[in-house]
Amino acid sequence: GKMTATERGRILMRFGELIVKNAEEVAQIEARDTGKPLSVARADIVAVARYFEYYGGAADKVHGEQIPYMNGYNVNVVRVPHGVTAHIIPWNYPAQMFGRSLAPALAMGNAAVLKPSEDACLSGIRLAELAMEAGLPPGALNVVTGYGHEAGAALTAHTGINFATFTGSPEVGVLVHESTAKNSVPCVLELGGK
C-alpha cells in the first residue's frame, strides 16, 4: 500500500540513526573500498546520516500550493513522485552520493534503483541493508551492481524508469542522456565535478 509522507519521514530518520550507530563499520567499508583515508570516510558517513535526517524531516513538509490566477480562478499545483528513479553514482564518494541522491528521492515517495560504480559498491550495499533494517519496504530501494556498459546501460534504457540521475564523466553522461531520451525520461547530469 501507499505509505504516508510522515511514515516515510520516520523511516528515513530511523535510517539516519542506524547510519550513526553503524558509522565506524560503514566508514571502514568505505575506506577499504575507495582507498581514501579512514578519517575522510568517517566524515563522509556523518554526511550520509545528515542527508537522511534532513530529508526524513522534510518528507511531510512538501505540499502543493494554490496560485491565484484571475477572476476567481486558481491554479492548483500538486506534487507527485516520479515513480521509479535511477541513480548512477561514481566511485570517489559512493557513501555521500548514496545519501545526496537517494534521500530526497525516497523522502518524496519514489522507488529508487542505485547503480554504484563497479570500482566502489560495498558501502552502498551495506547502507541499503541498513535502510531495510530501518523499515524501508522491499522494492523501495534496489541496488544493481555491475559494469556501467552492462548494468548502467540496461538501467537507463529500461522503460520502467521515470527519472534518472548520473554523476560522472562527460563522455558517459552523453550516453546516459541519449539512453534516457529514447524513452522521454527526465535526466539530471552532474558531469566532471572535479
What are these regions (language model features)?
Residues 21, 25, 36, 47, ...:
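Short alpha-helical
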